[in-house]
From Swiss-Prot:
SUPFAM superfamilies: L35p-like (SSF143034). PANTHER family: 54S RIBOSOMAL PROTEIN BL35M, LARGE RIBOSOMAL SUBUNIT PROTEIN BL35M. InterPro entries: Ribosomal_bL35 (IPR001706), Ribosomal_bL35-like (IPR021137), Ribosomal_bL35_CS (IPR018265), Ribosomal_bL35_sf (IPR037229). This is Large ribosomal subunit protein bL35. It comes from the Bacteria. One of its GO terms (molecular function) is structural constituent of ribosome. GO terms for biological process: translation. Belongs to the bacterial ribosomal protein bL35 family. The keyword Ribonucleoprotein applies. It comes from Ectopseudomonas mendocina (strain ymp).
Amino acid sequence: MPKMKTKSGAAKRFLKTASGYKHKHAFKSHILTKMSTKRKRQLRGSSLIGPSDVAKVERMLRVR
């Protein structure tokens, strides 16, 4: 049986940290003129994925 491959798209998007998986916010790439300054500011930086998505991300990254 060959080794399971990691989903390369997921490997580019998620980073394992001590407290969970880090990811960049969505809706921050283009057509930002319609979006308010407050909304753009809130989407800055990165955050941790929610507890309901941890199992899905780990499966894509072949953690378990």
